[in-house]
């Protein structure tokens, strides 16, 4: 690792005059390291020196021997997680020796590793892609023929990339000098593994002071990343037509889920010499205009004062605008400082938020005495008049708040007099400061992501003169899981009520359309650099017109301090929807969302079936590591099932992207007719080992994720065991 960093450092020095390069310790995500040669990918390319591996004496028999001992000298190898590793044991002998590998003294088999490995006997090499911490250990190659054997052991250490705050290139932004009327440019280079949020900030004075009462400087946000802003655009700040008022201190501020970094530069403004050389006649003319303008201004001012006195004392609207202050107490979010510390790990592009508390100093608890005691900056684009909102019945509760139905008059700009049904998110009475921070973060995230037909969209917010209300779209048909279950045909095996007539009869095209809509929603979220982390049917809502909308994508979840194997106070983790790399190594990417999308497809084509029913969590871990996957649902075509299994590939890079899924589903949907109703004779099946289900009762805990009472009821479905090694649900 040291030699690699050292080489990169030399390259940077050599090219410093030509371009700006990344620091040597920032290794790209898709870099492939080979223990003995970092210049080769070690994956799909043949070895340049492969001839060494085939040394063979045709004249006499010989026991195995090493053909290149230099490649065996380095025994200890440390590589970053997610890279590809190749171990080589170049050997010769007559007859050509066979090769086998041991890990920690035991035979190394494909099923011992998620994603397996490659063995190239021709080059005597072992290749492992996307290594994770569980791959650490001793790897021994044994070369043998009938005349003897030799062996060599490598030790592999997988180095997890420790999260770090953004790194700003030294010397940038640089101090700049320009003349009045000219243009100034500041450049800021930001390096960060997690997606950074970048802001340009201007320091200014208020009431003659640059520092506020709390000791923090007064700041004004000049430029921030938006939905359609590229990294290159946000890294450059232009100040056009500079005046003396523009002189001062400018800061480039970058924050991610780990922390914040900032560099400051000064803008110096010089007078325009050409303008100073104007003739005296021009100065005289200017002076005349100034005196005349001053006299006119005084007259107008006198008239206005007299008029105001006649109308009586009016309300004072001259209070200074809200300002944003730099806080070191927690990871920066958009326009927000939270007085209490927070260790939450936000999404990589979590927006920056500012909250100013007025709680009295003698309040020792973290509970909010009243949400109205918190001041939130007003966003005119999204602010909705509180008096036009009429709250209705509760719709449900979440981990930090509750949701109620409401009527909002004029929230649709095209129909200002009409009332629309909406859903309103608000805090509970016992909400904490962190709960408020989370709700504001979710609101700001939804602002950043923008609108799409297949996600729950933000409609507005009430942030002033009362508790925080976040207004979102209302989906009248509830979550997708219950929507599908209530539409199971009466004759379908394990329907809730065989005498019940379903509200609507589902066709095969309905299910494909549902899947296609959700793929489009996830494609949009991925394009906005949003990782969902909890994609499942329970987190999809259905509107009155059967439009599928992904929900809870803006929720900032804490993933640093979670026990993946035990029930927590917030319920169960969605282990049955989580990709192996997220489950075992806490690696969350768009490709881990693709895995969850495959499970969501399985839920759809089983009409709300529960994944892996009857399988304990510990057994599920073992099955996933061994490469087992759920069987094809009865109402699913081979092509769609292949799409599911592609989403469940062990190596994340081998899974399809959401863009590819949208294209494939669009094609399938176009070819599907409307008359294909569900075949009631097809049972719903899934993989399960052929052992009896020993649970004494059915629990909603199998599907409840963040709240033990996520469902009002979860009827126990009868199970038919030992039917071709499967369990039906």
Swiss-Prot record:
Its EC number is 2.7.10.1. Belongs to the protein kinase superfamily. Tyr protein kinase family. Fibroblast growth factor receptor subfamily. Residues 29-62, 683-729 are annotated as: Disordered. The lineage of its organism: Eukaryota, Metazoa, Chordata, Craniata, Vertebrata. Residues 31-55 have a biased composition (Acidic residues). It comes from Notophthalmus viridescens (Eastern newt). It is a single-pass type I membrane protein. Residues 1-21 form the signal peptide. GO terms for biological process: apoptotic process; positive regulation of cell population proliferation. Keywords: Apoptosis, ATP-binding, Cell membrane, Cytoplasmic vesicle, Disulfide bond, Glycoprotein, Golgi apparatus, Immunoglobulin domain, Kinase, Membrane, Nucleotide-binding, Phosphoprotein, Receptor, Repeat, Signal, Transferase, Transmembrane, Transmembrane helix, Tyrosine-protein kinase, Ubl conjugation. Residues 693-707 have a biased composition (Low complexity). Glycans are attached at residues 39, 138, 151, 175, 207, 228, 241, 256. Residues 389-678 form the Protein kinase domain. It comes from the Eukaryota. This is Fibroblast growth factor receptor 2. The chain crosses the membrane at residues 286-306. GO terms for molecular function: ATP binding; fibroblast growth factor binding; fibroblast growth factor receptor activity. ATP binds at residues 395-403, 425, 473-475, 479. Tyrosine-protein kinase that acts as a cell-surface receptor for fibroblast growth factors and plays an essential role in the regulation of cell proliferation, differentiation, migration and apoptosis, and in the regulation of embryonic development. Required for normal embryonic patterning, limb bud development, lung morphogenesis, osteogenesis and skin development. Plays an essential role in the regulation of osteoblast differentiation, proliferation and apoptosis, and is required for normal skeleton development. CDD domains: IgI_2_FGFR (cd05857).
